From Swiss-Prot:
InterPro entries: Aldolase_TIM, NadC, NadC/ModD, Nicotinate_pribotase-like_C, Quinolinate_PRibosylTase_N_sf, Quinolinate_PRibosylTrfase_C, Quinolinate_PRibosylTrfase_N. One of its GO terms (cellular component) is cytoplasm. Coiled coil: none annotated. Disulfide bonds: none annotated. GO terms for molecular function: nicotinate-nucleotide diphosphorylase (carboxylating) activity. Pfam families: QRPTase_C, QRPTase_N. It comes from Synechocystis sp. (strain ATCC 27184 / PCC 6803 / Kazusa). This is Probable nicotinate-nucleotide pyrophosphorylase [carboxylating]. The gene is nadC.
Length: 295
């Protein structure tokens, strides 16, 4: 009998409240400013000024509300107008935001704000490429827990903006029995049996498999999700057929060595999900620049 499925109730479709984010932003500003922004302070740039942010290449925007917040922490009167919505695709030379306020605050906050938005937009951009590559298939692209410590919430937020589904936000969202768990427990069967005896409440259980023998064993345990890890597409297609014939309610995830080049081949095997850490761990930053507007 299939167990009750409990999955993450709050995918990162929106940012956490400012009461949570503000300390992060203040810490990052303090890291950059140190004992003072001598370049800006030395020039006495405390009058009102204007600036705009421009995309220097095509991509997907993520994080502009946090950029606005960074500038407003430095200058509460700062006016920040977002011209590109979160998750919006933009082309090179697009003005994505304009701002007006204390010129010194604009220059002091520039690097921290740009770094944050460029990094998150890079994740959203590469994620969108992965999602679009399998748009003709029912397969969904999902992210992983391979994130920068302390930045998981923001990186998974950018991943969602790119179109991915969030996998576990943390270890408490669901149970994933990986190769080291299996090695420690003795077998897939022993691991799943022990988990079902000891879990405090019903959680979805996913088992990682690397060959057809392990797939058969995982099927017999009636887990909710079976991961096909680092399998060739021929073996993967056979595994999908075995699982569907045995129990069509079991969901199937493909993972390991996933690239843009092999995404469609993997999706064509019939898996439900394809997971990859690449958009978060390997995406280049989206190139943006701030331009001071002279009156």
């Amino acid at each position: 009998m299939m167990r009750i499925l409990v999955t993450n109730p709050a995918p990162m479709t929106c940012l956490p409240p400012w009461i949570i984010i503000d300390p992060w932003l203040q810490q990052w500003l303090a890291e950059d400013i140190g004992r003072g922004d001598w370049s800006t302070q030395g020039l006495g740039l405390q009058h009102r000024g204007q600036a705009r942010w421009v995309a220097k290449e095509n991509g997907v925007i993520a994080g502009l509300p946090m950029a606005a917040r960074i500038f407003q922490l430095l200058d509460p009167s700062m006016e920040f107008q977002v011209l590109a919505g979160e998750g919006q695709a933009v082309t090179a030379s697009t003005v994505v935001a304009t701002m007006a306020g204390n010129l010194g605050s604009l220059l002091t906050g520039e690097r921290v704000a740009l770094n944050l938005v460029m990094g998150l937009s890079g994740i959203a951009t590469m994620t969108r490429q992965y999602v679009q590559a399998i748009a003709d298939y029912p397969t969904r692209f999902v992210d992983t827990r391979k994130t920068t410590p302390g930045l998981r919430v923001l990186e998974k937020y950018a991943s969602r903006l790119g179109g991915a589904m969030n996998h576990r936000l943390g270890l408490d969202d669901a149970v994933m029995v990986k190769d080291n768990h299996i090695q420690a427990a003795g077998s897939i069967t022993k691991a799943v049996q022990t988990l079902r005896q000891n879990l405090p409440y019903p959680l979805a259980i996913e088992v990682e498999t690397s060959n057809l023998e392990e797939v058969q064993e995982a099927i017999a345990t009636q887990v909710e999700i079976i991961m096909l890890d680092n399998m060739g597409t021929d073996t993967m297609a056979t595994a999908v057929k075995l699982i569907r014939q045995a129990n069509p309610l079991i969901r199937i995830e493909a993972s390991g060595n996933v690239t843009l080049a092999n995404l469609t081949a993997i999706a064509s095997t019939g898996v439900d999900f394809i997971s990859s850490s690449a958009p978060i761990t390997r995406s280049p930053w989206l190139d943006l620049s701030m331009q001071i507007v002279r009156n």
